[in-house]
């Protein structure tokens, strides 16, 4: 067990490779990443046996920016017989189970990468899931409750119709979504599809049990670069009153809620109204990431907001390095003022050439 598979958006394999290499080295684990451009996944192979399992336990998954999922995997199973794919797959799981007790496993995902080529396998994967699940249950696996906070999900990751990896992820340190992708429905009354970015960000960064406490009708939000209102929509839906800052027009149905004030101003120059306590700042402006991170830092340092979600548009080259630089600069700015804070960042499914960042100031 010396390999990890990490899923990602196609085109971001090099960023995942750089990130997992960095994270592993911080734990004293060394290896190399196998990268195929636009494949939608990366294989990280550790030099020492059993270290992939350690990484899957000890690298906080919510701290990985570019990976959608992290699983410990077998060697590639090749040339599977179409008449009996299940037997060698079960045998591979049995080999893994010599090191990890699958009695606590609760779910099976038969997956592919998020590419057009791999999606041609999606129908097969869906049909293959039922017989494979039955075969694994005969081994005494997949019997735990899905709601438990320990144990594993089992994964069968097909890269071709006759080639797959088998593996597992830890329930307390993975994405619970199939293929690492949350399935969100576009609201019919939302002004733009960008609304799904903020919805996914809230689901990713804010624990469900805390959402009503941290986003509610007693709060005020500011949306910089708000037009036509995709992000404002998500705040208003949760009851916030929102100052929507943009020279462009906002959607009429948002005005109809009585929960927004349109401020036709430059997002970089806008300041919150005096005597108004702003709880949330959101920002999805197309601008250099260093300029956006400086703007967010100004809001936090001035005490203009307590919590923020914003996008950083990525450059064409050195994307991982630019992200780390921006996040480190923000952390230094806040630490120098003795502020207690938490930073999270993720390349969300609904992001493209950008990442989404969440910062919360703590008491």
UniProtKB/Swiss-Prot annotation:
Q: What is its main location?
A: cytoplasm
- What is catalyzed by this enzyme? cytidine(2498) in 23S rRNA + S-adenosyl-L-methionine = 2'-O-methylcytidine(2498) in 23S rRNA + S-adenosyl-L-homocysteine + H(+)
Task: Please name the GO terms of the biological process aspect recorded for this protein, alphabetically.
Answer: methylation; rRNA processing
Which GO molecular-function terms appear in the entry? S-adenosylmethionine-dependent methyltransferase activity
User: Which residues are annotated as active site?
Assistant: 313 (proton acceptor)
Sites where the protein binds S-adenosyl-L-methionine? 194, 227-230, 246, 266, 284
Q: Which HAMAP family match?
A: 23SrRNA_methyltr_M (MF_01551)
State the function annotated in the UniProt record.
Answer: Catalyzes the 2'-O-methylation at nucleotide C2498 in 23S rRNA.
The cross-references to NCBIfam families, in alphabetical order and at most eight, read:
PRK11760.1
- What does the annotation say about its assembly with partners? Monomer.
Name-wise, this protein is: Ribosomal RNA large subunit methyltransferase M
């Amino acid at each position: 067990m010396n390999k990890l598979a990490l899923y990602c958006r196609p085109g971001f394999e090099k960023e995942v490779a750089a990130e997992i290499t960095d994270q592993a080295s911080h734990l004293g684990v060394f290896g190399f990443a196998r990268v195929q451009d636009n494949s939608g996944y990366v294989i990280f192979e550790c030099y020492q046996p059993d270290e992939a399992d350690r990484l899957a336990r000890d690298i906080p998954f919510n701290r990985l920016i570019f990976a959608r999922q992290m699983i410990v995997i077998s060697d590639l199973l090749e040339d599977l017989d179409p008449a009996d794919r299940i037997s060698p797959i079960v045998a591979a799981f049995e080999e893994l189970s010599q090191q990890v007790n699958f009695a606590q496993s609760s779910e099976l995902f038969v997956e592919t990468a998020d590419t057009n080529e791999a999606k041609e396998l999606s129908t097969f994967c869906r049909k293959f899931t039922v017989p494979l699940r039955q075969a694994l249950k005969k081994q005494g696996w997949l019997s735990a409750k899905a709601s438990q906070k320990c144990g594993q999900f089992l994964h069968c990751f097909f890269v071709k119709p006759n080639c797959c990896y088998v593996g597992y992820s830890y329930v307390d340190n993975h994405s619970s979504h199939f293929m690492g992708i949350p399935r969100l429905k576009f609201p019919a009354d939302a002004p733009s599809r960008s609304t799904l970015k903020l919805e996914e960000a809230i689901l990713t960064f804010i624990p469900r049990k805390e959402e009503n406490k941290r986003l509610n009708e007693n709060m005020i939000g500011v949306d910089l670069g708000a037009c036509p209102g995709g992000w404002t929509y998500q705040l208003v839906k949760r009851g916030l009153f929102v100052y929507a800052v943009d020279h462009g027009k906002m959607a009429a149905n948002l005005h109809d809620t009585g929960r927004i004030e349109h401020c036709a101003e430059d997002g970089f120059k806008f300041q919150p109204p005096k005597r108004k306590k702003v709880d949330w700042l959101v920002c999805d402006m197309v601008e250099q990431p260093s300029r956006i991170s400086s703007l967010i830092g100004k809001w936090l340092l001035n005490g203009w907001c307590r919590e923020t979600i914003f996008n950083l548009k990525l450059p064409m080259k050195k994307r991982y390095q630019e992200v780390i630089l921006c996040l480190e600069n923000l952390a230094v700015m806040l630490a120098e003022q003795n502020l207690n804070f938490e930073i999270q960042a993720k390349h969300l499914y609904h992001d493209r050439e950008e990442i989404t960042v969440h910062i919360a100031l703590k008491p």
